[in-house]
Regions:
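Membrane-interfacial helix-loop connectors
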Residues: 37-48, 71-72, 123-160, 164, ...
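Transmembrane alpha-helical segments of multi-pass membrane transport proteins and ion-pumping complexes
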Residues: 38, 77, 81, 85, ...
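Alpha-helical transmembrane segments
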Residues: 72-81, 188-204, 254, 258-267, ...
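Interfacial loop-to-helix junctions that mark the boundaries of transmembrane helices
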Residues: 1, 21-27, 53-77, 186-195, ...
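Hydrophobic alpha-helical transmembrane segments
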Residues: 6, 31-32, 78, 113-118, ...
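Transmembrane helical segments that form the transport core of multi-pass membrane transport proteins
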Residues: 94, 101-103, 112, 116, ...
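Juxtamembrane and boundary regions of transmembrane helices in multi-pass small-molecule transporters
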Residues: 4-5, 147, 151, 167-168, ...
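Hydrophobic mid-bilayer segments of alpha-helices in multi-pass membrane transport proteins
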Residues: 3-12, 23-57, 74-86, 233-243, ...
Length: 447
């Protein structure tokens, strides 16, 4: 039966990895795999266990209890992501991200490279690397007319956005998972991973700035800055970003799960959105057509934002996290971790392999698996290194991260072009940051 379980999981995993080749959304194999695995466990009356992290051993449990336990842990992540996604969509409803374009005052390609890289690094730490990439590539399309130049910039945005997401508990779904699961605290994650992430960003940008693609000036007119469609755009941008940043502080003060703070932040942002939208503003360009408002129904910014949420991503996370939970409940991951430690005693090598692996396969199941494999306590450096490796390793292939996939779609970036031109920069940045992390850990933070 163990062989059947492993085959089903690997088949589902392969389908997720090959979603672009198979042309099916990865949520389909994730949900199917999850349901089939738990059905087999139930029908075959297989023994399920809960990992006792303190004693580092497996304790027998009942399927109803263990499934409810894992559903609760997964729901914490999903509700948190729903709140964050809605806040970002509310900012977009008021065209708040157009404010960022106003910061761009230079035509120098090299200065623009640094500007976009720093913006990607900071933005992704707040609104996550996927959303930051969408926002910056959209701005890129308005600022740079030459497509070949845009490809280079988009490639660098992928690297820097992923680096920016790795050090923040709200910057990447994998760091969010580790944070919500009480593997890392926000402060210690920042202390351990911020400097390696900066190295991971700066090294590739320094190397790329010597390329011909980033020499000279761009030809487009920077001065033709379009103001946000709403006068409340800048206010909603800063309010929304501030509300998301507030969540880690809320968790630290109250010791409540992060999704509670995110719901409070969403309520605050939504309140201001409703107040501002009552001033007859609508992002729709056809709002002046007589009778159009009534036809559209309730044009609430919250309703509109909720309708734009990336629900397939939420369902994918539900499927993959509960599928990995099935393997964890059977004790497979715990036993595999023991075998792995015997085969490769140096955990740093294991974690760096995780990082390289996250470029090939999705980093969400990788991190979910690592959480089931290792039982180290809160803020053990292992978890911080996993956060760094899984967050930044995906940059080595364009399909290795959500930021890469979305940039690939928006700019039609060729897989092999990225592999040839950008991948080595991502690898050098990843390796430099990893070395920096190990040196900091061994000689500065844990002397």
């Amino acid at each position: 039966m163990e062989t059947i379980i492993i085959i089903i999981f690997l088949a589902g995993y392969l389908a997720i990895t090959l979603e672009h080749s198979l042309k099916i959304d990865k949520l389909i194999p994730a949900l199917a795999m999850m349901a089939i695995l738990w059905a087999i466990i139930a029908l075959a009356h297989m023994d399920v266990f809960e990992v006792n992290a303190a004693l580092r051993e497996l304790e027998p449990s009942h399927i109803d209890e263990i499934l409810l336990h894992h559903l609760g842990k997964t729901a914490e992540i999903l509700v948190f992501l729903l709140g964050a996604m809605t806040i970002v969509e509310i900012i977009d409803y008021f065209d708040g991200f157009a404010t960022i374009k106003g910061f761009i005052k230079t035509k120098s390609k090299r200065k623009l490279l640094w500007l976009f890289s720093i913006l990607a690094f900071i933005l992704s730490a707040i609104i996550d690397n996927l959303t930051a990439t969408i926002v910056l590539v959209t701005i890129l399309q308005k600022v740079i007319n030459d497509r070949n130049t845009r490809l280079w910039f988009a490639g660098m945005i992928i690297i820097t956005a992923n680096a920016g997401g790795a050090w923040s508990p709200i910057g990447d779904v994998t760091t969010t998972m580790l944070w919500i699961a009480n593997k890392v605290s926000a402060l210690q994650l920042i202390i351990h991973v911020l400097i390696p992430s900066i190295v991971c960003m700066v090294v590739p940008v320094l190397l790329a700035s010597r390329y011909k693609a980033f020499k000279g000036d761009i030809s487009s007119d920077i001065d033709s800055f379009e103001a946000p469609k709403s006068k409340y755009g800048p206010i909603m941008l800063y309010l929304g970003l501030g509300a998301i940043v507030f969540v880690p502080f809320f968790k630290t003060i109250t010791h409540l799960p992060p999704y509670v703070g995110m719901m409070l932040s969403l309520a605050m942002v939504a309140t201001f959105a409703e107040i501002y939208s009552s001033s007859k503003f609508s992002i729709s360009d056809v709002i002046d057509v007589p009778g159009e408002r009534e036809h559209e129904g309730h044009h609430s910014p919250v309703h509109t934002s909720l309708s734009k949420i990336e629900l397939p991503s939420i369902l994918f996370f539900l499927g993959i996290l509960l599928a990995v939970a099935a393997l964890e409940s059977l004790g497979y991951l715990f036993n595999y971790a023991g075998s792995l430690n015997e085969a490769i005693p140096n955990l740093d090598i294991v974690v760096m392999l995780f990082g390289v692996g996250s470029a090939v396969i999705d980093n969400v199941p990788l991190v979910a698996a690592s959480m089931g494999m290792f039982s180290e306590p809160l803020d053990n450096p292992l978890w911080h290194f996993i956060a760094y490796s899984a967050g930044t390793g995906g940059s080595m292939l364009i399909i290795g991260s959500a930021a890469g996939v979305v940039a690939m779609g928006m700019e039609k970036i060729d897989f092999f072009w990225y592999l040839k031109k950008i991948a080595w920069l991502a690898f050098v940045g990843f390796a430099a940051g990893a070395v920096c992390f190990i040196l900091l850990r061994d000689f500065v933070l844990h002397v």
